[in-house]
């Protein structure tokens, strides 16, 4: 059982099927905030994140790229780690489900379930979505396709909209129904287990009370996964493989179980609302079958949406965190994500809201308070923070009360993972301190030598307020609190020690900096909002320090067409023409007539088109940056071993071909009619 001062928090492990966006960062930053808060309060924290690296989708992607699944996930895992480093995530471990120790324990657990009779062998038939790794019944499908007799012959996943396929295969099943009553009793005895409360009602009413169906826990149609030792043609399916990462990462089932003994059960599994069922039904039941303690809490947060719904490259509304960090700094992103949305609810990202938060909260309220305070202490007290002498002015007591209440409410909200509310308390203090300056009018008091004590009290009260704000901001912002402490003349050891919070603790005669540098410069709202929208529209908001051409695979691009997709080449009456920007152009090795284009046509990623015009362009680089016209809905085909995802229009005259150019101001992906 975990020791009293231990705290274990986890993100879901991410599936490495594509570049992570701001929504993934939202979950991971939230966990990081909680981990940093608990460390600040003296807890011994273990923060886990990682990657879920098995499954049919990964096997297929690797095959398309002509590399091994292991090589594919190795590359994707490194990309994840790089992003977490950029966001300064303080995780203690990054687990990968391809680790040998994890695979061994997963196989052992599967065999134990089998021996206990919790798992049985049967046959399964159902509609399966590869990207979602989920089976669906006919009644769950969307956009159902039927034959002339009314039989279902296809459809789409209700979760993602991806096409499904009918699969019939032998599978092992877990007897979920065996544990349904025990799970309900656990919910009753542990009312805080599922947060927010609405998620618990959803699980009970939609899944448990109607009758828990037994769960398919193995597959035979792919091989990239953990083999079942007693029946090697079966691969352990995602539920047992992925969910057990939370205990295998701590050494469960290994020779060294010291971390498991200390930190399990988990204090918090942080998940998105779309996977709450797996963590609050499947995972607890598996732990019951293993006779292990259940997690203390599963917190299912909402989605970070755009005004036009979920993020989608096809809509041109995906935001990658690297771009925001590079242009505005990490603190701005972390603050916005935790402040803008009530944690647990859905929130909407807009460029205008993001820039406004930075300007009003960080630059105006916090930044100006720090700048004014440092400047006045330098001007009136030669840079020395005066001694705290309690309530001297008629406004001192109210500011102290505001600070004390803010700290108390902040602690309550942080414990409940209501991060937006916790930050509101910090800004209540900051706003009150700014008002305190206007009330006390230090520039007038300074003219009267007989009011020197009042002036000194104002200065130290402002310094104390900023110190308290910096301490409360530590879990959220990884740079600004240190800068505030430095400008106030406090060393990091004292200035960022939670035990020093409270008025009367500021060291007398501390020397502030001579001139503080603004920690959050003001931004031009219109200019910066336009910049972000441009990055979203053009799909160029990946980290600019990264070479885009390095690991791009056109097979991963989700081609977007408003007309019927993938028509055959002889059916041109349905042709769709689009504007595309040339991002790269080069000759195809071993093919004298072919040029290979990388194009931004407003798709879910860049597309690749091969065109037989090499003899007319001796320097293909000259085409980079041009806007061209493409046939967007041709079925992709292979040419000289390369995928070609459309056709570039060219005009023929005097026996030569020249690319048809679109207007330079036309947005990428716009239709031509």
Curated annotation (Swiss-Prot):
Keywords from the named record: Aminoacyl-tRNA synthetase, ATP-binding, Cytoplasm, Ligase, Nucleotide-binding, Protein biosynthesis, RNA-binding, tRNA-binding
Motif ('HIGH' region): 14-24
Residue positions of motif 'KMSKS' region: 310-314
Catalytic function, reaction form: tRNA(Met) + L-methionine + ATP = L-methionyl-tRNA(Met) + AMP + diphosphate
InterPro entries: aa-tRNA-synth_I_CS, Anticodon_Met, Met-tRNA-synth_bsu_C, Met-tRNA_synth, Met-tRNA_synth_2, Methionyl/Leucyl_tRNA_Synth, MetRS_core, NA-bd_OB-fold
Protein origin, superkingdom: Bacteria
Transmembrane segments: none
Matches recorded under Gene3D superfamilies: 2.170.220.10, HUPs (3.40.50.620), Isoleucyl-tRNA Synthetase, Domain 1 (1.10.730.10), Nucleic acid-binding proteins (2.40.50.140)
Known EC number: 6.1.1.10
A Pfam short name: tRNA_bind
Subcellular location(s) of the protein: Cytoplasm
Similarity comment text for this entry: Belongs to the class-I aminoacyl-tRNA synthetase family. MetG type 2B subfamily.
Protein name: Methionine--tRNA ligase
The species this protein was found in: Oceanobacillus iheyensis (strain DSM 14371 / CIP 107618 / JCM 11309 / KCTC 3954 / HTE831)
Gene: metG
């Amino acid at each position: 059982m975990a020791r009293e001062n231990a705290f274990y928090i986890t993100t879901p492990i991410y599936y490495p099927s594509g570049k992570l966006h701001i929504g993934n960062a939202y979950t991971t930053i939230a966990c990081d905030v909680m981990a940093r808060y608990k460390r600040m309060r003296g807890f011994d924290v273990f923060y886990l994140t990682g990657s879920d690296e098995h499954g049919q989708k990964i096997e297929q992607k690797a095959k398309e790229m002509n590399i091994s699944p292991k090589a594919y996930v190795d590359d994707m895992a490194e990309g994840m780690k790089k992003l977490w480093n950029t966001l300064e995530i303080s995780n203690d471990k990054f687990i990968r489900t391809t680790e040998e120790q994890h695979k061994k324990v997963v196989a052992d657990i599967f065999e134990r379930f089998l021996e206990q009779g919790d798992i049985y062998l049967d046959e399964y038939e159902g509609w399966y979505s590869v990207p979602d790794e989920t089976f669906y019944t006919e009644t769950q499908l969307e956009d159902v396709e039927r034959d002339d007799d009314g039989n279902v012959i296809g459809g789409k996943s209700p979760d993602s909209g991806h096409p499904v396929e009918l699969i019939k295969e032998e599978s092992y099943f877990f007897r979920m129904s065996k544990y349904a009553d025990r799970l309900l009793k656990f919910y009753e005895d542990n009312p805080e287990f599922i947060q927010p409360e609405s998620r618990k009602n959803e699980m009970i009413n939609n899944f448990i009370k109607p009758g828990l169906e037994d769960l398919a826990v193995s597959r035979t149609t792919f091989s990239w996964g953990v083999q079942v030792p007693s029946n090697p043609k079966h691969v352990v399916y995602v539920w047992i493989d992925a969910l057990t990462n939370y205990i295998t990462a701590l050494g469960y089932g290994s020779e060294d179980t010291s971390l498991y003994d200390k930190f399990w059960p988990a204090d918090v599994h942080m998940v998105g609302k779309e996977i709450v069922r797996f963590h609050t039904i499947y995972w607890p039941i598996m732990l019951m079958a293993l006779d292990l303690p259940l997690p203390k809490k599963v917190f299912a947060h909402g989605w970070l949406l755009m005004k036009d719904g979920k993020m989608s490259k096809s809509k041109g509304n995906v935001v990658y965190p690297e771009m925001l960090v590079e242009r505005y700094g990490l603190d701005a992103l972390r603050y916005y994500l935790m402040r803008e949305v009530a944690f647990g609810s859905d929130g909407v990202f807009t460029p205008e809201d993001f820039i406004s938060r930075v300007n009003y909260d960080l630059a105006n309220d916090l930044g100006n308070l720090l700048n004014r305070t440092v400047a006045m202490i330098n001007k009136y007290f030669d840079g020395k923070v005066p001694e705290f002498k309690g309530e001297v002015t008629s406004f001192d007591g109210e500011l102290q009360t505001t600070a004390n209440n803010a700290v108390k409410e902040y602690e309550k909200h942080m414990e409940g993972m209501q991060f937006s509310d916790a930050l509101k308390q910090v800004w209540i203090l900051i706003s009150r301190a700014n008002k305190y300056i206007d009330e006390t009018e230090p520039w007038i008091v300074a003219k009267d030598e007989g009011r020197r004590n009042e002036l000194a009290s104002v200065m130290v009260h402002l310094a104390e307020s900023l110190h308290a704000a910096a301490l409360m901001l530590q879990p959220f912002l990884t740079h600004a609190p240190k800068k505030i402490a430095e400008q106030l003349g406090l060393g990091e050891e004292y200035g960022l020690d939670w035990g020093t919070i409270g008025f009367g603790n500021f060291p007398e005669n501390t020397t502030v900096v001579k001139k503080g540098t603004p920690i959050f410069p003001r931004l031009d709202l219109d200019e910066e909002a336009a910049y972000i929208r441009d990055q979203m529209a053009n799909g160029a908001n990946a980290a600019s320090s990264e070479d885009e051409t390095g690991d791009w695979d056109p097979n991963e691009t989700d081609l977007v067409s408003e007309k019927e997709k993938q028509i055959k080449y002889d059916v041109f009456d349905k042709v769709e023409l689009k504007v595309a920007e040339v991002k790269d152009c080069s000759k195809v090795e071993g093919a004298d007539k072919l040029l290979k284009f990388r194009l931004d046509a407003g798709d879910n990623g860049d597309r690749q088109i091969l065109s037989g015009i090499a003899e007319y362009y001796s320097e293909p680089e000259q085409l980079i940056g041009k806007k061209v016209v493409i046939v967007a809905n041709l079925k992709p085909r292979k040419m000289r071993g390369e995928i070609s995802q459309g056709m570039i229009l060219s005009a023929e005259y005097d026996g030569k071909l020249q690319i048809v150019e679109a207007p330079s101001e036309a947005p990428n992906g716009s239709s031509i009619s």
